[in-house]
Structures are given as structure tokens and as C-alpha cells.
């Protein structure tokens, strides 16, 4: 999708976490095949949306540099204590110029090229508040992927209230709203790097 004065979907790259299992390193800036993970994701996410935001609480200048080719804007959490992806979602929903926000984590370099379209189709068909990706493996086991989701920005005030009340679990907040699950069979597309070991494994895939 191309940028427009009234975008319909805002893309949100979630890059604001602590990365405790990577010794606090900024995950989105770690290299895979010589390229920062965040840039891999931006290259896949941005063509699917009308505008792009990057949720980043550290290294804002570096993320702005990575996001420049996509006209991405940087947004930070409203609180400084790294409360988790819900806070990044809220920042993105507040900053979005579109009525829908499609989020993806910064450490998933293989995300599907049609993830936003499929989430949007399901959201629209079910008149849902949230559409969330779920992977299904060869044994039919389902694995929710809550940070791959499409959400209505009209939920921002409710999310702010939930955060103020101490909610930190993404799926728990989703459960308060009409959420549709969208199945994806390609597990590889959702592989991520929560640790140095997983980053090394990504490089071998």
C-alpha cells in the first residue's frame, strides 16, 4: 500500500522491549545476514500498510535512520519502566493516523508478505475488534502469535485503562474484546529471536 493523506492501516514495528534474554541488547539492532533485524521486518511490513511507526524506547536515532526509507515515525512508551508490548501498542494506537494498526515484533525477519491482508479480511468478515495470527503445525498444534495482530485504534482508551490497572499480558487484554484468530501454516514465517541462541538459529534457517 502507498502512503496517503487518510491511511486505512498503520503498521507498527514493536521494538521497545528490554530483551532480558539477550543481556539487554536492543534486539531490533542485532544483525542477521549483515542487516539489522528491524530492517528485515520493515522491508516486509511497510509494503503492506499505508504508514509505518516504530515503537522504540532506546536508540531512537538509529531506528529513525532505519525507518527513513519507509517514512517511519518513532513513538515511545508513555511510561519509562518498559511495561511490555501493550505499552508499545498503546503508543502506536495513539500516534496512528489510520483506524487500524497492524503490529509485528522487531525480531521476526520472515513475517508473511500477506499477513496484514489476511488479518484485515478476517477482522472485516467477523466485525471483530482484533485479529490475531495463530500458527498451526503439522500435528495441528496451535500457537497464538499475539504480537502479530490487527487492532482498531478506537480501543486505545480501554488499553490505557487496562495498563493503568496493571495489565501486562497481551492475550489477557485481547480476551476482553472480540478477537478473531487467523491460522497460518508456515511456522517459519513467525520465527523470532528472543535469545542469542535463537538469533544464531535464525541465521541457519
From Swiss-Prot:
Highest taxon listed in the record's lineage: Bacteria
Binding site for Mg(2+): 107
Subcellular location: Cytoplasm
Cofactor dependence: Mg(2+)
Subunit structure: Monomer.
Known role: Transfers a GMP moiety from GTP to Mo-molybdopterin (Mo-MPT) cofactor (Moco or molybdenum cofactor) to form Mo-molybdopterin guanine dinucleotide (Mo-MGD) cofactor.
Protein family according to the UniProt entry: Belongs to the MobA family.
UniProt protein name: Molybdenum cofactor guanylyltransferase
Species of the source: Burkholderia ambifaria (strain ATCC BAA-244 / DSM 16087 / CCUG 44356 / LMG 19182 / AMMD)
